[in-house]
Amino acid sequence: MSRRGTAEEKTAKSDPIYRNRLVNMLVNRILKHGKKSLAYQIIYQAVKKMQQKTETNPLSVLRQAIRGVTPDIAVKARRVGGSTHQVPIEIGSTQGKALAIRWLLGASRKRPGRNMAFKLSSELVDAAKGSGDAIRKKEETHRMAEANRAFAHFR
């Protein structure tokens, strides 16, 4: 039996202005080269732009966007008898949120536009409405899992 203790699960901290964990998760994912103040600046500008576009609470739009993009199921490569199968697996809520944030940021980086705050706000508003690149990525993942449903017993 191992003598190592189990690591305590870290709880996500809240951001200083909105006191929201999702905003903090977004900040930590957009972070590049340790420039956290710039990451906060981009996120807060994006939230302001979302407020102007939708004229509703921007945090509810953010929650709705992340809920819309969060996948329930994904595929994982599993090697069985010399061939690799894409095995569908269920995703937990924390991992799903992390994937959703990664997809939203990736989709907003690919968008044409002036700056990251503008692109991110546009992607979040689109995702909340049920369109956009991140939603397409989620649907693609679900289709892939559905197509490989026959391999679910390899789990």
From Swiss-Prot:
The keyword Ribosomal protein applies. GO terms for cellular component: chloroplast; small ribosomal subunit. Keywords: Chloroplast, Plastid, Ribonucleoprotein, Ribosomal protein, RNA-binding, rRNA-binding. Pfam families: Ribosomal_S7. Coiled coil: none annotated. InterPro entries: Ribosomal_uS7, Ribosomal_uS7_bac/org-type, Ribosomal_uS7_CS, Ribosomal_uS7_dom, Ribosomal_uS7_dom_sf. One of its GO terms (biological process) is translation. Disulfide bonds: none annotated. It comes from the Eukaryota. GO terms for molecular function: rRNA binding; structural constituent of ribosome. It is found in: Plastid, Chloroplast. Gene3D superfamilies: Ribosomal protein S7 domain. Belongs to the universal ribosomal protein uS7 family. One of the primary rRNA binding proteins, it binds directly to 16S rRNA where it nucleates assembly of the head domain of the 30S subunit. This is Small ribosomal subunit protein uS7c. It comes from Allium textile (Textile onion).
